[in-house]
Amino acid sequence: MNRGDSIMLLDLSNVLSEQHKSVDKNVSISMDEFRLRGKTYPVLSKDELHIQVEYAGDQKLRVSGLTNLTIGIPCDRCLEEVPVDFKLDFTREVETKEAGVASDEADQLDENNYIDGYHLDVEKLLYNEILVGWPMKVLCSEDCKGICSVCGQNLNEGTCSCEDTGLDPRMSVIRDVFKNFKEV
């Protein structure tokens, strides 16, 4: 999903009217891929999003959601695709834009970019929630050996015939210290 093109809009006119009716729906997720920093990650599985929107007073909305997604993210060592589960269970309180004027704080943080007038953009909301839960490091297993820096062979699947270049020559002093330590 590009942050600019989004399809799923939820009508908030009943919530923002004087009656302040709440919205409680199950919404199908149309997101088939997740784009981040120029890379595309496939959405492997997705449940419906259960979303609730209610008026929280003082021109604020309380947005709650619950869903599960699985996204294929490459292992940081061997580049094999790893299914990563995102269990999204969130509640956000956001300010509404009164007469088209947003608060300066909300503009700076861009924390409610998924509410535009009387519509809530479900795809942008999901994008933001996935982004918050995005893992810092993804490994296929704790003992992943990665890939050969010379030929690119996945070392989990077998060894390669490249010569072991050993340590960086600048690290030879440290290697010698460890050799001397082992001899003692």
Give the residues covered by each predicted segment:
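Structured interface patches
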Residues: 1-184
